[in-house]
Amino acid sequence: MKKIEAIIKPFKLDEVKEALQAAGVQGLSVTEVKGFGRQKGHTELYRGAAYVVDFLPKVKIEVVLADDMVEAAVEAIVSASRTDKIGDGKIFISPVEQAIRIRTGETGEDAV
């Protein structure tokens, strides 16, 4: 099993969710996050004072999948979230040792 973490622009969330569902992903978690990378921040003016906005709003999507679903899920995320502009986001893939469904006690891929 693998865990995919994708950090994307917030307005792309619905498109990515629909693309993942079309690829067969049955569940995901979403967290609102803030961060910066090459996109950096920007300066804004508020009541005559300039201030730097270092952290930009993003959305983090997390899914745990069987190994054979990872490629399709990554393709779905990339195709749905790409704008070809700086700040499109990142995807991280990590191994998952075990998953347990609390309600039933199922383990491994059956729990996902």
Curated annotation (Swiss-Prot):
Matches recorded under Pfam families: P-II
Gene3D superfamilies linked to this entry: 3.30.70.120
Gene Ontology MF annotations: ATP binding; enzyme regulator activity
Keyword field: Nitrogen fixation, Nucleotide-binding, Phosphoprotein, Transcription, Transcription regulation
O-UMP-tyrosine found at: Y51
Cited InterPro entries: N-reg_PII, N-reg_PII-like_a/b, N-reg_PII/ATP_PRibTrfase_C, N-reg_PII_CS, N-reg_PII_urydylation_site
GO biological process, one term: nitrogen fixation
A single GO cellular-component term on record: cytosol
Complex and partners: Homotrimer.
Similarity section: Belongs to the P(II) protein family.
Role: P-II indirectly controls the transcription of the glutamine synthetase gene (glnA). P-II prevents NR-II-catalyzed conversion of NR-I to NR-I-phosphate, the transcriptional activator of glnA. When P-II is uridylylated to P-II-UMP, these events are reversed. When the ratio of Gln to 2-ketoglutarate decreases, P-II is uridylylated to P-II-UMP, which causes the deadenylation of glutamine synthetase, so activating the enzyme.
Protein name: Nitrogen regulatory protein P-II
